[in-house]
Regions:
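Structured alpha/beta or helical-core interaction and ligand-binding surfaces enriched in interleaved
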Residues: 1-116
């Protein structure tokens, strides 16, 4: 008789903690700007200072950029990306955002990543 371990799903707190650890481990390897990091059960949200920082994330991790109105003459540019794939095949969604004044000049490679 062979005993099989029982794998219990993580609690919401466990998911939040696991996601944060995954992103922090990635940041140890990639050294990307992440001045504000908020972990949730479904994703980790990073707010960066400017478009140059968003560009660093895009070059390192790839992904799709979404642009939405943030009101008062601002747009919110958000990169949808993930951590590298873990041993179990999973990855953590990462949302990297920066507020940008409407009409601001944006680098071509970032514009090219904007979802149609």
């Amino acid at each position: 008789v062979k005993a099989e371990p029982i794998v219990r799903p993580l609690s919401e707190f466990g998911l939040i903690s696991d996601n944060r650890v995954a992103v922090e481990a990635m940041l140890d390897f990639h050294t990307l700007p992440a001045p504000t990091l908020i972990s949730r059960a479904d994703a980790v949200f990073v707010t960066v200072a400017d478009l140059d920082d968003l560009g660093e994330w895009l070059r390192a991790r790839g992904g799709i950029v979404h642009v939405s109105s943030a009101g008062d003459g601002l747009e919110l540019w958000t990169l949808l990306t993930t951590t590298p794939t873990r041993a179990d095949g999973s990855s953590v969604p990462v949302r990297v955002s920066v507020p940008v004044p409407m009409g601001e000049s944006v680098m071509a490679y970032i514009r090219a990543a904007v979802a149609a």
